[in-house]
């Protein structure tokens, strides 16, 4: 589908979900008797949310059987994943990805990925971004656009914010105490999920206790599972980057949640929570590409603990509605244990014995963080000053400690040599600041929102915690970052159905420890630190139109995000000697000064970027529009399209291609069963939108030249059809099932291709493009789950 098709498609969706429907709702509401009673809703811990927030609630998590981040973004437009083979580095929103998209759990941000491209191409570190098992989650807010007012550093292009379950979420509606048991299976990675939880909600005590376990294998590629290579290999099941099927892997993860809140009396409430996840993914990297006689097996490990204590006071006051104090603690570990070696050679036959593996090295590389924070929040009662104001003030102080520690074993002639090292100095980061927001209702038509936040961040390198072979031994000087962020918005409620609005939000990201301080000194090239880095900045403008009525809903957003001070890994070429003079020519006296080149890398603020786009989402209750259609039938449609521009020669590769989703759903009025369908169109990435820079020479001894070229691996467009549903034989038992990629289309997503490395021992294909089949999306696959509450 060409971009020019966007306007007719938008007009079509607008005509389906548009004015006549909601105008009828508004007219009906004006003539109908005033018998409708709205239920009172109490909101705690509210977000200052812009219009472009996609909330995935517990019902949708269960209905769509969301098991991981790929499932989460499956039916979301303009949201992708930062995918890098063995590792997922978070999300891609509004043209940026990875550390530029914030991820938080109950308001506590997860740490950045600290790996740079120097080490990424070798695969010895675990560069994954931590997450949380959806089994522990009740709401997920996908914020599309800058959002540093709410989440601080990192929400440059948006954020994904998880809220953990409460006791009520585990109970039947009429129960105060109950048990929930859930089992599920997914064929795409042969994964079993087993969950058990206990919940209490009796008015005074709200408590939840839950444990979940996942066990599975590699994700299939177009119906192909991963198998270990037999002998020298044949067909698609071979070793090296041309391998055509996934690398075999096994994973096992444990997740838990313990949460309790106690209402001491009408005005005072206390609570505590603890949640965490730990596990590993063991991969036999048959696609490892060092040399044909080399092998590697990798065990990627992650561990996370989040704890919280809080106190709430709701005073009997004419101006103060809430005082809340929080203490948060987080500890994380992302590690990779790599087993490497050679296949031995039979010196009688001079054949490689692929059935044996000789261990040469075991690398245990770990990135650890510890985080502490204290927060105080004050919310006002509605205050009258030209309109109704609701003020919220927050102040906070935090400290995050980061360190890298590597424990490596080297095997030689039956002996083991053990070393402990690090690649950079530990860093302590302190942050303090405050924020103030105001939600204003001016009259029955106009409302506005505004907020401002100040952050002061100090990064202090510490003494080395182990030997560092290729870095400066003296801790660098501390770095300080200060700045303001905020939001402002104005909305008009045109009638009971339609609302229009404009929002501007800002974001920032403080460079992480690796970007500022990492050094690597080597004769062929250095990685230089840059203590003069600035924080990345962004702002997002959003024009929104929202319609709500008994016949359906429509959300339309036009947006533009601007980025500046973009951090980029820049290369500086240093040359000496006579061009064309090789070492061999010098040896034979044909020239006197051999030519040498050295590439130095350094993080620099150089780029600006802009992304513009449109998002449309609509739902239509067919029985409210067409009289002969039974109750329960619904139409769904969603479109996302974006166009980006990056200063310089490169493209913003993380910009998502066109995505269109349409569906027909039926849910019985008794809510006993339902069937849902989704047809997704995934647009192709165009070469002109995928430009990148390489340095190449034309032969030995010739100078390196900068070249801008098309990204070599572009996805084609594809249609994918899914069906899923549920059935409740009794009120406390729910069976869910789904079939995905029903017509078994063979396709590849842009997210899976843009993470490939051109020159690497891992997550790569060969120079002829062989091995791309390994990155195809799963073929026809299914998932089932059974949930029992009692």
Report residues per predicted region.
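C-terminal beta-signal and adjacent terminal beta-strands/loops
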Residues: 222, 508, 559-565, 569-571, ...
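Gram-negative outer-membrane beta-barrel transporters
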Residues: 441-444, 448, 457, 559-562, ...
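Face-selective signature of the C-terminal outer-membrane beta-barrel domain
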Residues: 263, 267-277, 302-467, 482-483, ...
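Transmembrane beta-barrel wall of Gram-negative outer-membrane proteins
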Residues: 187-216, 227-284, 303-306, 378, ...
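Outer-membrane beta-barrel translocator/receptor signature
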Residues: 121-123, 135-144, 148-231, 251-254
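Acidic, small-polar-rich N-terminal luminal/periplasmic segments of exported/outer-membrane proteins
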Residues: 27-170, 289
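Short loop/turn motifs that connect adjacent beta-strands in outer-membrane beta-barrel proteins
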Residues: 151-152, 167-177, 204, 267, ...
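Outer-membrane beta-barrel signature, preferentially recognizing the C-terminal barrel domain
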Residues: 289-291, 295-318, 425-429, 474-485, ...
